Amino acid sequence: MNAEKSPVNHNVDHEEIAKFEAVASRWWDLEGEFKPLHRINPLRLGYIAERAGGLFGKKVLDVGCGGGILAESMAREGATVTGLDMGFEPLQVAKLHALESGIQVDYVQETVEEHAAKYAGQYDVVTCMEMLEHVPDPQSVVRACAQLVKPGGDVFFSTLNRNGKSWLMAVVGAEYILRMVPKGTHDVKKFIKPAELLGWVDQTSLKERHMTGLHYNPITNTFKLGPGVDVNYMLHTQNK
């Protein structure tokens, strides 16, 4: 497993990276700042595995892997997983946790654009979860993901819709009222409307296959997937 440093790339927001570097040591604390990620991970994993026809024996790339929550769970499903992130500290946490868990994941500090220049068409599945809203040029990430997946392979994106409801739920509610995530985690101006994401997808070799919303019920304190993409949503695409 590696956590290699790489040259600075244009599509990096160092303020965004610093946010996650500051709390990286608590990435695997089930009651800490990343509790929501742990809570929704089974939903994400189930959606990805079902839509991709299983993960066993497949070569998978997790773009913006952070501390490795999704990457590890996909490796447990029998996938050969590479995790990309530009945060050095989150990758160190991911690397150590994988060692402790006996899980093999290859962690690399590199942008997805740099990775695509070297490994085009190498992956059966590419995942990019809650990462697009943290980079200056999300369309560039979509292009790179399309380049990295094999013909017929699957690419999954998740992000936040940009509207008043998502601001109330993801920023006011999650950060300030319920304190589910650290204040300042999200910038509503960087949220992405589904039509925008689909427009970027249409300019690549990817084709939309399915879209679903991720919903939180504060009364029951539960998450579920279902219709409605007005706040969090996931998109399944496939390389033509």
Swiss-Prot record:
Enzymatic class: transferase
Signal peptide: none
Pathway where it operates: Cofactor biosynthesis; ubiquinone biosynthesis
Gene Ontology terms: biological process: methylation
One Pfam family cited in the UniProt record for this chain: Methyltransf_23
Listed InterPro entries: SAM-dependent_MTases_sf, UbiG_MeTrfase
SUPFAM superfamilies in the cross-refs: S-adenosyl-L-methionine-dependent methyltransferases
Protein keywords: Methyltransferase, S-adenosyl-L-methionine, Transferase, Ubiquinone biosynthesis
Gene Ontology molecular function, alphabetical: 2-polyprenyl-6-hydroxyphenol methylase activity; 3-demethylubiquinol 3-O-methyltransferase activity; polyprenyldihydroxybenzoate methyltransferase activity
Residues involved in S-adenosyl-L-methionine binding: R44, G64, D85, M129
Methyltransferase listed as a keyword: yes
EC number: 2.1.1.222, 2.1.1.64
Known catalytic reactions: a 3-demethylubiquinol + S-adenosyl-L-methionine = a ubiquinol + S-adenosyl-L-homocysteine + H(+); a 3-(all-trans-polyprenyl)benzene-1,2-diol + S-adenosyl-L-methionine = a 2-methoxy-6-(all-trans-polyprenyl)phenol + S-adenosyl-L-homocysteine + H(+)
Similarity annotation: Belongs to the methyltransferase superfamily. UbiG/COQ3 family.
Function: O-methyltransferase that catalyzes the 2 O-methylation steps in the ubiquinone biosynthetic pathway.
Protein name stated in the entry: Ubiquinone biosynthesis O-methyltransferase
Organism of provenance: Escherichia coli O127:H6 (strain E2348/69 / EPEC)
